[in-house]
Amino acid sequence: LNHRFNFEGLDVLMTHIGGYPGKYNKRVRMIFEADPPKLFICGHSHICKVMFDKEYNFLHMNPGAIGHHGFHKVRTMLRFSVGEGLIKDLEVVELGIRGNNVKTNMN
């Protein structure tokens, strides 16, 4: 399933399985060819990665995995702010080794 929305002037498309620049699946590639977003967020690979897609002119984000199950070694997420259609203060938050309960202060 896709979720497309506008937040603070930023056109965002989120989906679970989407791929990476140059290797998108057909479903999302068709969306990009018709009307690309400014921010594309997808997951599935459990690999935390942020990159700019020059072909479709948007920022691609995969927050990694925050859960305790999977092949990832470190639990990750992305934190950022949005204002006036721009992404600001992007950071990777590491929540510890997969399988360990780690208390964090997420203020």
Could you tell me what each predicted segment is?
Residues 1-9:
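Core catalytic region of metal-dependent phosphoesterases/phosphodiesterases
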Residues 83-107:
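Charged phosphate-binding loop/patch that engages nucleotide di/tri-phosphates or the phosphate backbone
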